Amino acid sequence: MINKHIIGLKITTTNENNQAQEDINQLRKSFYGQSNAELQTFKKEPYTYVVYTNYQGDFQQGNYDCYLGIASESTLTGFASCDIKLEKYQIFDFPYYNPQDTLEARKTIWADQSLKRAYLADLEIYDFEHNRLQIIISTIED
């Protein structure tokens, strides 16, 4: 089971018309600016998380929330937070060297038509120290 409390920044976006790419790039700029320094004291793991949740459709259409942050046991004033609890999910591991790697990893997952997605929450876990990206997709089946 995955059980995480994430604090950081939040946007609502859509993949329609490449809007998410623009919105998430702006979110990253904000996070890695002033916001990241404030959050470091609350960080309980060396990872950075991106959480996609509250899907109003699937990955191709409809709005969803995107959080960029850290795992923490605290909630911090001025920052968004979300709780992720997943019992059924599939894990994908990829090398990570730049933001384009995330898009290529997502394309690989989106192309997998056997994946039975639940659209509860999906996570990207960035391990910058080891150049790894782990993507966790909520599924209907194990």
Which stretches of residues belong to each language-model region?
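A solvent-exposed interaction/effector surface
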Residues: M1-D142
